[in-house]
Amino acid sequence: MSNIVQKNDPVLRGKAKIVPIKEIGAMKTRELIEKMKIAMHSQKDGVAIAAPQIGESLQIFAIAGSLLKKAVKNYKGDENDLIFINPRIIKTSKDKKEMEEGCLSVRWLYGKVNRSTRVTLEAYNEKGKKIVRGASGLLAQIFQHECDHLNGVLFTDKANEVWEMTAE
């Protein structure tokens, strides 16, 4: 599965390390981001991926831009993948909603997780620029799911109900 680690790998349970600011634009970081994108796009249902999912304990996640273009109402960005380095959710709505989730590292299990309907995320992009981004709906759900990965939490830890589906 294109080097995507699975739920029993200890890297998924640790708190990922912060990427030093001076290393954000470094070749090593750029190569890691490229590996993440390749792994994410190797799966038809790949929506987003965090560095620990490819065995690297660093606070980075990527979201498939092509998915956002299709799935997020009024999405104004292009189809480039979005990169978030050292992300922190700085604000969450009190409104919560139970949402279905799956994960490339917990293959073929799905569940319902109670998530905030709106969040604000602070992070650095791959060029080292600090960004603050508000999100609702699917994008807010992805931000929360990926930040959980960076803190050693899998969606199955929070799910109210979990079921298995087969690859189709």
Pin down the residues of each PLM region.
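Active-site rim/adjacent substrate-binding subdomains
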Residues: 1-144, 149-168
